[in-house]
């Protein structure tokens, strides 16, 4: 009686087990199919994206390279074609002061007061910053001579200054001039006379051109062009140095014959470092443009040689009698006046009234 009742249970259990196995098989098959499909899809995506990724990486590298090259060429062209003016354009005096002298340090306060003095009492409204080097005093003076169209000094009208180097050698026996040094170039040798002659010839040519030009704006434009050429500038400054040496030599020859000479030359020859023209050249003049600029006695000689009254506002001497000084102190004639300003006695800028 028990056997017939148990047979249906067994059949039911068998059907249940069979259904479970089928479900498990379907799940397994589905999982395998999905896994295979995922592998195929991933392989397809990787196969598709790899070239795209490589292409993107290539163009990104190319973009960075071209950007770097473009930046380099822009900088190169700017450096090549930008005028490197050694005398900058006019800027408002008080704005320049505010930019350069900030803070409450004692020196900054002194400079601000000195600039205010220039603005209100001396009616200086603008300033032209001058390149800082050991030629800046000569540059500041010559720029104003050219920009104002000043004429030749009287003594330069009477003599051909281009022939002065040979005159010193052959007429006055100054063979020591072969030791003349051209600023940082430090050139000495048998061709000194040829180099000096070219420098003086350039100065005469440029001075003649500027002094004969009546158009103020045209003079200004030509000044900007000339004072952006470092090679021509150096030649002009060496010509000025030579004219100073010539005047010192002339005064020395006059002193030897007991003639009256300006007091500034007596002061020059009384110094241990410059008792004669050779010592002056070796100990002072040759260093100008190289290791030092002009000192006070050099400024006197420069003003005398060019027949201009050089008025210097020395801002570091504010509130003293030496705030404004002139070189020479007492011009022999009514020479034209040009002005400089200095914050430390070494570097000069151009005030604009």
Curated annotation (Swiss-Prot):
Record organism: Mus musculus
Keywords, comma-separated and alphabetical: Cytoplasm, Endoplasmic reticulum, Membrane, Nucleus
On whether rRNA-binding is a keyword of this UniProt record, the answer is no
Q: Does the keyword Zinc apply?
A: no
Which top-rank group of organisms is this from?
Eukaryota
Subcellular location(s): the record lists: Cytoplasm; Endoplasmic reticulum membrane; Nucleus envelope
* Residue ranges of every copy of the OTU domain listed in the record: 125-353
| Topology in the lipid bilayer | Peripheral membrane protein
Family, per entry: Belongs to the peptidase C65 family. Otulin subfamily.
Segment forming the signal sequence = none
**One of this protein's Pfam families, by short name?**
Peptidase_C101
Checking InterPro entries in the record gives: FAM105, OTULINL
Per UniProt, subunit arrangement is: Does not bind ubiquitin or ubiquitin-like proteins.
Domain free text: The N-terminal region that precedes the OTU domain mediates interaction with cellular membranes.
What's any one GO cellular component for it? Answer: cytoplasm
Where is it chiefly localized?
Answer: cytoplasm
Q: What does this protein do?
A: Lacks deubiquitinase activity.
Official protein name in the record: Inactive ubiquitin thioesterase OTULINL
Q: From the UniProt entry, list the residue stretches annotated as the region Required for membrane binding.
A: 1-80
Q: What processes in GO biological process is this protein linked to?
A: protein linear deubiquitination
What is the organism lineage in this UniProt record?
Eukaryota, Metazoa, Chordata, Craniata, Vertebrata
């Amino acid at each position: 009686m028990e056997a017939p009742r148990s047979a249906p249970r067994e059949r039911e259990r068998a059907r249940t087990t069979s259904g479970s196995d089928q479900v498990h098989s379907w799940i397994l098959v589905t999982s395998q199919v999905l896994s295979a499909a995922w592998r195929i899809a991933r392989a397809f995506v990787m196969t598709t994206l790899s070239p795209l990724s490589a292409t993107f990486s290539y163009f990104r590298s190319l973009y960075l390279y071209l950007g770097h090259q473009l930046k380099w060429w822009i900088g190169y062209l700017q450096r090549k074609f930008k005028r490197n003016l050694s005398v900058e354009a006019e800027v408002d005096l008080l704005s320049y002061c505010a930019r350069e002298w900030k803070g409450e340090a004692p020196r900054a306060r002194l400079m601000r007061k000195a600039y205010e003095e220039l603005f209100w009492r001396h009616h200086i409204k603008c300033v032209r910053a001058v390149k800082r080097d050991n030629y800046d005093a000569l540059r500041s003076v010559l720029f104003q001579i050219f920009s104002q169209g000043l004429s030749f000094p009287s003594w330069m009208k009477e003599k051909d200054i281009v022939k002065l180097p040979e005159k010193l050698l052959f007429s006055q026996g100054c063979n020591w001039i072969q030791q003349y040094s051209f600023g940082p170039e430090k050139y000495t040798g048998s061709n000194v006379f040829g180099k000096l002659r070219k420098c003086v010839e350039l100065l005469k040519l440029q001075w003649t051109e500027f002094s004969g030009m009546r158009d103020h704006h045209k003079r200004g434009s030509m000044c900007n062009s000339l004072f952006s050429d470092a090679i021509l500038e150096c030649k002009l400054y060496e010509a000025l140095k030579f004219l100073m040496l010539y005047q010192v030599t002339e005064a020395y020859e006059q002193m030897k014959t007991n003639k009256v000479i300006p007091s500034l030359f007596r002061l020059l020859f009384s110094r241990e470092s410059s008792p004669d023209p050779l010592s002056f050249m070796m100990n002072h003049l040759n260093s100008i443009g190289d290791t030092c600029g002009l000192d006070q006695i050099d400024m006197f000689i420069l003003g005398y040689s060019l027949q201009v009254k050089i008025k210097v506002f020395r801002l570091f001497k504010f509130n003293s009698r030496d705030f404004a000084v002139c070189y020479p102190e007492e011009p022999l004639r009514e020479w034209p006046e040009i002005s400089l300003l200095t914050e430390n006695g070494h570097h000069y800028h151009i005030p604009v009234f």
